[in-house]
Swiss-Prot record:
It is found in: Microsome membrane; Smooth endoplasmic reticulum membrane; Mitochondrion outer membrane; Secreted. This is Membrane-associated progesterone receptor component 1. The modification Phosphothreonine is found at T73. Residues 1-24 are lumenal. Belongs to the cytochrome b5 family. MAPR subfamily.
C-alpha cells in the first residue's frame, strides 16, 4: 500500500505541476504580456516584412518611361519640377539628370525639392538650399572657388553614377545636340538602383 500511495502521490504531483504551470501563465498579467509578445514576434517572423498592398500603391507612382536624350534651356527645365510634370529633372554642372526615382528627396515635398526643375549646381557647390542661390538663367559658375568646384565635381560624379543622364543644359543662343536613339551611357549596369 505504501508503494501505491507513493505512485498516487507522484501522479498527483505531475498533474498539479502541469495544471499549475498553465494556471500560472494565465493568471499572471506579466506572463500573459510575455506570451502575447512571443506570439506577436513569432507571427512577424513567419509572415515576414511584406508591405500591405494599399500602402505600396499610395507611396510609389508607376515608373515613367525612359526619357529620350535631349538638351534643355533653363526655362524648359523648369517644367520638370514634379508638380507641372510628374518627371523630375535637375541640372548639375551643365548635365541634366532624371531624378524622378529619388522623388522622396527631390520632389515637391522633399528636402532638396528646391532644386527640382532647376540648375542645382550653385546650391550643391555652396551647400545652400535657399531659392535665392539658384538663378533663373544659365549660370556659368565662373565665380566658384576651387573647393566649391571640387564639391560640385563630387556631386556630378554621384549623380552620373546614380541617375539617368538625359542631356545638357543649354547656354543662351546655344543650339541643342541631336542625339540618336541608340546613344546611351556605356555601362548601365553600374548605375545604382534606389
Amino acid at each position: 500500500m505504501a508503494a501505491e500511495d507513493v505512485a498516487a502521490t507522484g501522479a498527483d504531483t505531475s498533474e498539479l505541476e502541469s495544471g499549475g504551470l498553465l494556471q500560472e501563465i494565465f493568471t499572471s498579467p506579466l506572463n500573459l504580456l510575455l506570451l502575447g509578445l512571443c506570439i506577436f514576434l513569432l507571427y512577424k517572423i513567419v509572415r515576414g516584412d511584406q508591405p500591405a498592398a494599399s500602402d505600396s500603391d499610395d507611396d510609389e507612382p508607376p515608373p515613367l518611361p525612359r526619357l529620350k536624350r535631349r538638351d534643355f534651356t533653363p526655362a524648359e527645365l523648369r517644367r520638370f519640377d514634379g508638380v507641372q510634370d510628374p518627371r523630375i529633372l535637375m541640372a548639375i554642372n551643365g548635365k541634366v539628370f532624371d531624378v524622378t526615382k529619388g522623388r522622396k528627396f527631390y520632389g515637391p515635398e522633399g528636402p532638396y525639392g528646391v532644386f527640382a526643375g532647376r540648375d542645382a549646381s550653385r546650391g550643391l557647390a555652396t551647400f545652400c538650399l535657399d531659392k535665392e542661390a539658384l538663378k533663373d538663367e544659365y549660370d556659368d559658375l565662373s565665380d566658384l572657388t576651387p573647393a566649391q568646384q571640387e564639391t560640385l565635381s563630387d556631386w556630378d560624379s554621384q549623380f552620373t553614377f546614380k541617375y539617368h543622364h538625359v542631356g545638357k543644359l543649354l547656354k543662351d543662343g546655344e543650339e541643342p545636340t541631336v542625339y540618336s536613339d541608340k546613344e546611351e551611357p556605356k555601362d548601365e549596369s553600374t548605375r545604382k538602383n534606389d
